[in-house]
Regions:
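N-terminal signal peptide
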Residues: 10-25, 397-401
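C-terminal low-complexity, Ser/Thr- and acidic/Pro-rich disordered "stalk" regions positioned immediately N-terminal
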Residues: 329-376
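Cleavable C-terminal sorting propeptides in eukaryotic secreted/cell-surface proteins
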Residues: 376-401
Length: 401
């Protein structure tokens, strides 16, 4: 009788101990060192890291949720990475410096906190879930062979950075809200088209080396909107954008001929310069307030901001052509007190277009000028150190004598 009572208790205790043991192993960080790892956890509470020695094809099956990070860096012999079970990664999904990786398939993945794909020279496309990844906080895709990003189906993101992907000539996104920064730079050999037809609000937007950028539903930019070094961009329109909080910039866009902001009423700093073919600046019919300064420089033949009634900063306008009529507009605004800072307007200025007006390609890397400055700084440091060393040596010799 007692045995019959004790036996179930012993079995139950054994099951509890085994479950506790399994739970402990699923709470630890896991390092993968072979191509078909056994991970008997539905939920991994730590990180999963792939060892640099793994080569060929790697399948990670078993876990459905990773509450830590999935890190695959410097695994230079890896050709294929896949999982049919992982549906969410609560930390970073990081793939960097995988020189041979050509296949990436996570057929159940729907959610990831931070996605980093960088320096993947052979990776041409992504396969994420049946509907793609639908939730992410930050995404960075840099220096890859990717030509298709249809696996990303995000509605809201904090930060999205896409740069230096030479084969990426089209990015069509369903994003509605960007709470921090959108950076699209140096993709598609200057011929990239970006379609963000659902985007309504954004904080910071930085665009370089694109040929087309479409945001028909955009209504508000809570930081800045910047177009710099877009040699193939010929026009831009924001038909529903009413407010830009910090700054609006068009700089060094060689083929730019038209910009249109038909309902924009308020902006921060306004800068339009070094756009050699932009001869008519008439795209601000409702702009009344500029909370900052104005810098306009180019080959303008016509400049109109008819409703402008307040500029809280200074105004500096210059053109290689005769814009005396528009200069009178700013002179009168200054005399009325509508311009609170300094005001200067110059016609027929041969230096109105700067040296960078070729609209040349930009990139995410530093410029040669920066390198030269760094070299000069380094030389200065060496010179100072040598001088200090010389003084120290002389002082030492004096003491010896």
């Amino acid at each position: 009788m007692r045995f019959n009572q004790i036996l179930p208790a012993v079995i139950a205790l054994g099951a509890t101990v085994k479950a506790q043991s399994d739970d402990d192993s699923c709470s630890e960080d896991i390092t993968i060192r072979d191509n078909n790892p056994t991970i008997n956890c539905e939920v991994v509470r730590g990180d999963i890291t792939v060892d640099e020695s793994v080569a060929g094809e790697l399948n990670i099956n078993g876990p459905e949720e990773i509450r830590g990070n999935l890190i695959v860096n410097n695994v230079t012999g890896l050709i294929s990475l896949s999982s049919s079970t992982i549906s969410s990664i609560n930390g970073r999904f990081e793939l960097q410096d995988l020189t041979l990786l050509s296949n990436l398939q996570f057929s159940s993945l729907r959610s990831v906190e931070d996605l980093v794909l960088a320096r993947l020279a052979q990776l041409g496309s992504l396969t994420f879930g049946t509907t793609g990844v639908t939730r992410a906080s930050t995404i960075r895709i840099s220096d890859t062979h990717i030509s298709d990003l249809s696996g990303l189906r995000i509605a809201t993101v904090d930060s999205l950075q896409i740069d230096n992907n030479d084969r990426l000539v089209l990015f069509s996104s369903d994003l509605v809200n960007i709470t921090d920064t959108l950076q699209i730079i140096a993709n598609g050999n200057d011929n990239m088209t970006v379609e963000m037809n659902q985007l309504e609000t954004a904080a910071e937007i930085q665009i370089s080396n694109v040929a087309n950028f479409e945001v028909p539903a955009l209504t508000e930019v809570s930081a800045s909107l910047k177009f710099e070094n877009n040699p193939q961009l010929s026009s831009f329109s924001a038909p529903n954008l009413t407010e830009i909080a910090e700054s609006l910039t068009f700089n060094n866009n060689r083929e730019l001929r038209n910009i249109s902001f038909p309902v924009l009423t308020s902006s921060g700093d306004l800068t339009v310069e070094n756009n050699a073919n932009l001869i008519a600046l008439e795209g601000f019919p409702e702009l009344t307030r500029i909370e900052g300064g104005v810098r306009l420089a180019g080959n303008f033949e016509s400049v109109e901001i008819p409703e402008l009634s307040l500029v809280t900063g200074g105004v500096n306008v210059t053109s290689s052509t005769d814009i005396e009529e528009f200069c009178e507009f700013f002179d009168d605004a200054k005399s009325r007190g509508d311009i609170r800072g300094e005001e200067e307007c110059t016609s027929e200025d041969p230096d109105a277009i700067g040296e960078e007006a070729d609209g040349g390609s930009g990139s995410g890397s530093g410029s040669d000028d920066d390198d030269d400055e760094d070299a000069e700084d380094a030389a200065g440091i060496v010179g100072v150190n040598m001088a200090v060393l010389t003084v120290a040596v002389l002082a030492g010799l004096t003491q010896l004598l």
